[in-house]
């Protein structure tokens, strides 16, 4: 497979970007996208709403776990299987469907995902046996999970690297807010309707309303189908009602020069990206941060409802709210900072290379312009995670637990935004597939640690467990140091093609 590995090499990607910039620098180019700021805002709203149901579907289930354990007359460890299974399928599904979206368009895959999600939610609300509940949760995850990766693909379609971070941050912030407030919503539904079935009826209704909205206004953005947005899609599934309105109709100029060539459907595409050494070292810490956040949410509901705190379901739900807000704010701040820092480093690069011919310039250090910002979320995760475990262990005041969950959720959301943006930058033609790698790593790690959480707590206690998780986070964070070092060395040791030719001639002489 050496040929496939070369195809997805980061260094090759960066060099190709440099050559592309040189070739087109003197040409009059069509705009990167015809989507204006209002169009992008509408897309952010639609994608955020769709992704919200994907994000909320996992944590909304947590407050119901004690109730479901009693209802199905089973044990907490057996009940956790449904949580782990959900996370596994949430990770696997986007690696397949994101390729479908890259090949056949974003719109039909998103709409199909919502339909499957709604149908499964209705089925779960009528379930009376545990094995069927666990099975249907797998289908629920597989149905709606792809929208996270596809949303990042849309950002790659309509945003340049200079402003891509802002859109990824805004969309992922609104989506991950569902992950933050899911516990509160689940607790409110159980308390208000006195049945766990209300959770899935709520999800079905919310998903159905979102489907109608998306069906009307979600425009196709895939550059393989609509180019920069100026080409009218041929397939009816890719056509939104929106494109027939005067505001959008005037932008349809059928500029086929902006159309990307269609590639074959490659089911292994995401895995070819996933197992690149530098990509894997970036995915591992971001996935570990998300996994730590997920298990902290699980412990939060279990411990606060236990005899130690004896909180009601609704009171536990309220504790979830602050970290949900922190998650949303964190992603928005990350998006702003990514845009600002990219422009700062790009301007610095342009000034340094002002007197260097285009052909002799090293490629812009795109990796450093993204990953340098990870130092803040890394520090916040270490502080928040270690404090969370020991505060629960010794039954400290609830405010200390809330503050620690704020640090954890803020850190996880910022890390997700940074790593997702970087992968979309590196693989813009496979933006959906690259973003699905983030999803795959975060969900599989979350499934792994959720599955073994009870056993680790039994052996080490809460404080020891979260201290161990802190250490694992620190260990995986070393991967980012390696990636940054490699990127900087590549920049410092760059030899231009002209210099190579001169050296070669000198040796011949």
Curated annotation (Swiss-Prot):
Pfam families: MFS_1. Residues 63-75, 130-132, 191-197, 300-312, 392-397, 454-455 are extracellular. Induction: Expression is repressed by caspofungin and during chlamydospore formation. Also regulated during white-opaque switch, and by NRG1, TUP1 and HAP43. Disulfide bonds: none annotated. It is found in: Cell membrane. Residues 1-41, 97-106, 156-169, 219-278, 334-370, 419-432, 477-509 are cytoplasmic. The chain crosses the membrane at residues 42-62, 76-96, 107-129, 133-155, 170-190, 198-218, 279-299, 313-333, 371-391, 398-418, 433-453, 456-476. InterPro entries: MFS, MFS_dom, MFS_trans_sf. It is a multi-pass membrane protein. One of its GO terms (cellular component) is plasma membrane. Disruption phenotype: Leads to defects in biofilm architecture. This is MFS antiporter QDR1. It comes from Candida albicans (strain SC5314 / ATCC MYA-2876). The gene is QDR.
